[in-house]
Amino acid sequence: MDIFGSGEHRPRVLFICTANVDRSRTAEDLYADDPRYEVKSCGVAPFATIVVTRDLLEWADHIFVMNESEDHHVTALRRRFPGLSKEVVDLDIEDRWKRGHPELVRRIIARLEPHIGKPKAKPATAPKA
């Protein structure tokens, strides 16, 4: 199946940061209404809003972490889930902005565009007459 969903289910995309508060939630917000994907987000820290689990990793067709160099997201996943064989893409986005900040939005879109394209909203439906 290609990444743009020509198969039977929409590709499932998982966004991961540390606490699942700002970066991964912003990415989820951006793609939540995109008809091409199913999206979820979580964090690697035990105090994360939604903590990453093996079930979430198995659910995902595509896994994106926010930052390996500062936050060690890939390392944390490989350590906690040693049998993880799926590709994990590091977006290299630092933890410097709050959820929805314009610079965070710009960086997320720029880093994800080569992988899953820019976010698209679901088409609006006409009101019933």
Give, region by region, the residue ranges found by the protein language model.
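Conserved active-site segments centered on acidic
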Residues: M1-H62, H72, I109-A126
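Mid-chain, well-packed structural core segment of small domains
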Residues: L56-I93
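Phosphate-binding/catalytic loops
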Residues: R78-A129
